[in-house]
Amino acid sequence: MRVRNRKGATELLEANPQYVVLNFLEAKAKWRDLFGNDNPIHVEVGSGKGAFVSGMAKQNPDINYIGIDIQKSVLSYALDKVLEAGVSNIKLLWVDGSDLTDYFEDGEIDRLYLNFSDPWPKKRHEKRRLTYKTFLDTFKRILPENGEIHFKTDNRGLFEYSLVSFSQYGMKLNGVWLDLHASDFEGNVMTEYEQKFSNKGQVIYRVEAEF
């Protein structure tokens, strides 16, 4: 989702170093120091305007959250939500999330969220899908043994592809939801996309996969 450039976005991000980590390369292997505790660290790749990551941080104060997005203006809106939520257990990264080993040491994070990632439906773009095996290689490195990926999408094709990709990689599927909002799953925090699609009656798919 491309968002129109927001005037003052850079200044807003720079004015809130308690939430926005600008020296991200120096943060590698030091995230627990930045949070000031040893609580688990959960990362959302492609956090958009921040509804999910800020909502999760508010819902789970004993877990540290990191939201990543490549778009500066989008991340500034995520910062708005973080400030509104009044939470301290969250950091935001304005970076390209294609290689998370640039920002995280091996085993440094405890869970990864992939929400409504670009489906890249054309076969020639398969390697760009975040559930493609080369991305799974990267995710496995930064997660601990038995680390989990929690994945949500409205795109059935991407969901089916991801189930196969996880399984072929040798991952264990701990939970599969073919219609999340019609299930008894508790504690779901919606993204902006999820709210939009749900309002249109679209089915939301979810899976928890463990390395």
Curated annotation (Swiss-Prot):
InterPro entries: SAM-dependent_MTases_sf, tRNA_(Gua-N-7)_MeTrfase_Trmb, tRNA_methyltr_TrmB_bact. It is an enzyme of class 2 (transferase). Residues 124-129 are annotated as: Interaction with RNA. Keywords: Methyltransferase, S-adenosyl-L-methionine, Transferase, tRNA processing. SUPFAM superfamilies: S-adenosyl-L-methionine-dependent methyltransferases (SSF53335). The active site is at 118. One of its GO terms (cellular component) is tRNA methyltransferase complex. Pfam families: Methyltransf_4. GO terms for molecular function: tRNA (guanine(46)-N7)-methyltransferase activity. Substrate binds at residues 122, 154, 191-194. S-adenosyl-L-methionine binds at residues 44, 69, 96, 118. The keyword Isomerase does not apply. It catalyses: guanosine(46) in tRNA + S-adenosyl-L-methionine = N(7)-methylguanosine(46) in tRNA + S-adenosyl-L-homocysteine. Pathway: tRNA modification; N(7)-methylguanine-tRNA biosynthesis. Its EC number is 2.1.1.33. Belongs to the class I-like SAM-binding methyltransferase superfamily. TrmB family. This is tRNA (guanine-N(7)-)-methyltransferase. The gene is trmB.
